[in-house]
């Protein structure tokens, strides 16, 4: 009798613990996937409406450039846009003394102008060869042009040189126009050179070639 009562009591305790364990197991179990998908679908739709970018596909994300493409892009990144120009263009505020000596001033221009005008071609060669500035050489060109006009007029209207232009007046006009063009060329080019310090003062350093 005692054994039967103990076994029945043991079975009764086992029956009482089973509902509790089943309830705990059901509470610890994760919810089904269908319920999660239904609850979170609204959240995903809300993110899509906000305009967040979608991640790329697996093929796009895992596509790597080839070796040649990687080397080409690396070489393009190392090559400067304008090679070898940094040394030529140096910012400065105004022309330095060396540039001013190469341009010259009004005094040198007038000196070489009168040398070429008074001493003709001898003064032209002396003033053109002895001066290295633009003002001196343009002054020599302008003075030689005016000297050429002077001698053409002297020969044309003087009684000491008869018969020089008889029947060849076109030659007189050629030399007259040539002297006038040389005279204007010297003055105009020197005026342009004089304006260069003002025009290039705010620009990078520029090398200018003077063609006489």
Swiss-Prot record:
Residues 1-40 are annotated as: Disordered. Residues 129-134, 185-212 are extracellular. Residues 1-107, 156-163 are cytoplasmic. One of its GO terms (biological process) is ubiquitin-dependent protein catabolic process. One of its GO terms (cellular component) is perinuclear region of cytoplasm. It is a multi-pass membrane protein. Keywords: Golgi apparatus, Membrane, Repeat, Transmembrane, Transmembrane helix. A motif (PPxY motif 1) lies at residues 30-33. The chain crosses the membrane at residues 108-128, 135-155, 164-184. Residues 1-14 have a biased composition (Polar residues). It is found in: Golgi apparatus membrane. One of its GO terms (molecular function) is WW domain binding. May play a role in Golgi structure maintenance. This is NEDD4 family-interacting protein 1. The lineage of its organism: Eukaryota, Metazoa, Chordata, Craniata, Vertebrata.
């Amino acid at each position: 009798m005692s054994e039967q009562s103990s076994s029945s009591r043991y079975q009764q305790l086992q029956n009482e613990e089973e509902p509790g364990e089943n309830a705990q197991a059901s509470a610890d179990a994760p919810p089904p996937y269908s319920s999660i998908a239904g609850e979170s679908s609204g959240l995903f739709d809300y993110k899509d409406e906000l305009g967040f970018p979608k991640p790329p596909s697996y093929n796009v994300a895992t596509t790597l450039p080839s070796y040649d493409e990687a080397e080409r892009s690396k070489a393009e990144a190392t090559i400067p846009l304008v090679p070898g120009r940094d040394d030529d263009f140096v910012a400065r505020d105004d022309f330095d003394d060396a540039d001013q000596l190469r341009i010259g001033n009004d005094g040198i221009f007038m000196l070489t102008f009168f040398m070429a005008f008074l001493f003709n071609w001898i003064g032209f060669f002396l003033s053109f060869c002895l001066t290295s500035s633009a003002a001196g050489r343009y002054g020599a060109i302008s003075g030689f042009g005016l000297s050429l006009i002077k001698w053409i007029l002297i020969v044309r209207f003087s009684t000491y040189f008869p018969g020089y232009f008889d029947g060849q007046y076109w030659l007189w006009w050629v030399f007259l126009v040539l002297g006038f063009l040389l005279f204007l060329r010297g003055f105009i080019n020197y005026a342009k050179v004089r304006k260069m310090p003002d025009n290039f003062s705010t620009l990078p350093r520029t090398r200018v070639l003077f063609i006489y």
